[in-house]
């Protein structure tokens, strides 16, 4: 009996105990509890998400140089829909997006135009701060070798005219309008003949002929804003007359325009004037002149551009349609201006 009892006790260790419903097996004496509970710590001032957002923003800007036009378009759309509230970030956005004015894809250029409009509406005056680089790319687009890029160039110019002042670039933009429309600034008979027959020029393709309507509309807008907008003196007189100050007080205040005395050339080398016997401005002197005041712009228009523009616009008036109407509007503006 004693032997059988010992055998049963030894076999207990190798038998699986049958547990009742709801009962758990008894834990051995040498059991060690290895379970643990995790707790999260929230720090309101932690910058983990901010760093991640900055990295994501930088990555998006880098995708603007992606080889796929679809990717570039989607990135521009995403940036347009999620513009930051911090104005400091707009410098990076404009610097990265403005080169896409020369993008080969028309869809990308359209989205860049929408981006510039959104920036202008959300941050007034911001496009005016970056107008120098934007104008450079617009001028490059106006003289680009691809017709599609030339056709959309004036649309960017119209957007910039809405939110910025382009008086300093009056001459450059007009000269590139002549190139865009295949007009000539020369006086010889050969150039006049070419300037009249604009339909036979190499730069005008089928799509470009349709785009001339947009070009002329923007030209009308450009001329009105730079030649007919004489509100500077009127606003000053109106404001100061309301508060009953001396009429000449505004002359002794800080100028409202940047580099107001640039025309005096106080810090530059004196350049000999190339005026003709009648006192008109020479073409060679255009690049050295500042055009912030309306008198200078009117003199430049009357001496250099007016007669040649009217000559070429009359050729467009003969075509009729919308092109003829816009050309006729330009002629009315040019014939109505006078030196003040």
UniProtKB/Swiss-Prot annotation:
GO terms classed as biological process: maturation of LSU-rRNA from tricistronic rRNA transcript (SSU-rRNA, 5.8S rRNA, LSU-rRNA); pre-replicative complex assembly involved in nuclear cell cycle DNA replication; regulation of DNA-templated DNA replication initiation; ribosomal large subunit assembly
Gene3D superfamilies, A to Z: Leucine-rich Repeat Variant
Keyword list, A-Z: Nucleus, Ribosome biogenesis, rRNA processing
Record-annotated membrane-spanning stretches: none
Primary location: nucleus
GO CC annotations on file: cytosol; nucleoplasm; rixosome complex
Region (Disordered) location: 1-20
Any one Pfam family match given in the protein's UniProt record, by short name: Ipi1_N
Gene Ontology MF term list: chromatin binding
Subcellular location: Nucleus
Similarity comment: family membership: Belongs to the IPI1/TEX10 family.
Function: Component of the RIX1 complex required for processing of ITS2 sequences from 35S pre-rRNA.
Complexes and interactors: Component of the RIX1 complex, composed of IPI1, RIX1/IPI2 and IPI3 in a 1:2:2 stoichiometry. The complex interacts (via RIX1) with MDN1 (via its hexameric AAA ATPase ring) and the pre-60S ribosome particles.
Full protein name: Pre-rRNA-processing protein IPI1
């Amino acid at each position: 009996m004693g032997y059988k009892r010992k055998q049963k006790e030894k076999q207990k260790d190798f038998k699986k105990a049958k547990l009742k419903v709801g009962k758990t097996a008894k834990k051995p004496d040498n059991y060690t509890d290895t379970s643990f509970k995790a707790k999260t710590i929230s720090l309101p001032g932690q910058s983990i998400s901010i760093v991640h957002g900055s990295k994501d923003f930088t990555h998006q800007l880098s995708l603007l140089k992606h080889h796929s036009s679809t990717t570039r378009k989607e990135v521009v759309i995403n940036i347009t829909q999620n513009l930051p509230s911090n104005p400091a970030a707009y410098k990076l956005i404009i610097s990265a997006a403005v080169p896409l004015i020369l993008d080969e894809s028309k869809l990308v250029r359209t989205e860049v135009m929408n981006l510039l409009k959104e920036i202008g509406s959300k941050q007034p005056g911001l496009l005016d701060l970056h107008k120098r680089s934007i104008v450079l790319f617009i001028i490059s687009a106006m003289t680009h070798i691809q017709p599609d890029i030339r056709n959309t160039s004036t649309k960017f110019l119209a957007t910039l005219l809405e939110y910025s002042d382009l008086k300093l670039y009056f001459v450059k933009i007009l000269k590139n309008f002549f190139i865009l429309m295949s007009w000539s600034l020369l006086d010889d008979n050969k150039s006049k003949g070419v300037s009249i027959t604009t339909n036979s020029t190499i730069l005008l393709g089928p799509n470009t002929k349709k785009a001339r309507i947009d070009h002329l509309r923007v030209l009308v807008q450009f001329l009105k804003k730079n030649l007919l907008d004489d509100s500077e003196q009127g606003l000053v007189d109106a404001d100061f007359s309301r508060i009953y100050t001396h009429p000449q007080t505004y002359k002794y205040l800080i100028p409202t325009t940047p580099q107001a005395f640039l025309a005096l050339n106080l810090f530059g080398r004196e350049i000999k004037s190339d005026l003709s016997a009648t006192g008109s401005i020479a073409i060679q002197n255009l690049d050295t002149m500042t055009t912030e005041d309306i008198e200078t712009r009117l003199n430049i228009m009357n001496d250099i551009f007016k007669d040649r523009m009217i000559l070429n616009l009359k050729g467009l008036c003969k075509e009729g349609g919308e092109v003829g109407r816009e050309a006729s509007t330009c002629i009315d503006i040019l014939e109505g201006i006078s030196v003040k």
